Amino acid sequence: MKLKPLILSNWKLNGNCLLVKKILLKLNEKLKNKNNLKVVIAPPVIYLSEFKKYVLKKNIFLAAQNVDVNLTGSFTGEISPIMLYEFGVKYVIIGHSERRLYHNESIEDVTKKFLILKKFNLIPVLCIGETKKNKDDKCIENEIVKQIDFILKKIGIEGFINTVIAYEPTWAIGKKDSASPKYIQKIHKFIRNYLSKYDNDISKKIILQYGGSVNSKNVKKIISQKDVNGVLLGRSSTNIEEFLYILDIIEKTKKS
């Protein structure tokens, strides 16, 4: 099954109101009369309203970088899934390695977030991946399976309908080089094959993204891989020209 490429731009703690306006005006023009790409922007939550103001195209979607598992209450600084849903957010990143590292988020925490997002029809972008380079494929596979299984046991394979899985090896994030295309395909194929044991049809419909030092120089080889359905971009997506160039490359590559 051919899946429409999904490009997610994670701004992290970057950006300003002017950049929001510039990028959205360019994106609206860029995606005019095009329906073969899905572009998702995850700005800092304070800029979500600015994005909503300028989004004109149906294939540009809003995402949040995080969510709390509580719906209301005395939880200073948090944002609930209800708030995101009411605001028109469609995707929410969970399990990002930076959240695990700097905020001590555990597999249990990520699973709770996954479940609450599903309850409110928000699409989880579930980030998984190994923390260290390892020549032992079995160790890497076990680490990935552990992250997936925790959720599978709670919600079953049906819970992965309308879910994005972003494979992001921690050792490749924010570095000069990404993982090699061959390696990325091997891991993506493993993830899809593993999920297919539970339900082959569902596994074919799950969007598998790669994240970790993706840029205009390496994106063509990455997106050309059979089981790569999109990319999770970081710093490269806040550079307007670089971001638009990456979209061009993905569009042309997936057309051919």
From Swiss-Prot:
The active site is at 96 (electrophile), 168 (proton acceptor). It catalyses: D-glyceraldehyde 3-phosphate = dihydroxyacetone phosphate. Transmembrane segments: none annotated. It is found in: Cytoplasm. It is an enzyme of class 5 (isomerase). One of its GO terms (biological process) is glyceraldehyde-3-phosphate biosynthetic process. Pathway: Carbohydrate biosynthesis; gluconeogenesis; Carbohydrate degradation; glycolysis; D-glyceraldehyde 3-phosphate from glycerone phosphate: step 1/1. Substrate binds at residues 10-12, 174, 213. It holds the Pfam family TIM. Keywords: Cytoplasm, Gluconeogenesis, Glycolysis, Isomerase. One of its GO terms (molecular function) is triose-phosphate isomerase activity. GO terms for cellular component: cytosol. Its EC number is 5.3.1.1. Its main location: cytoplasm. InterPro entries: Aldolase_TIM, TIM_sf, TrioseP_Isoase_bac/euk, Triosephosphate_isomerase, Triosephosphate_isomerase_AS. Homodimer. Belongs to the triosephosphate isomerase family. Involved in the gluconeogenesis. Catalyzes stereospecifically the conversion of dihydroxyacetone phosphate (DHAP) to D-glyceraldehyde-3-phosphate (G3P). This is Triosephosphate isomerase.
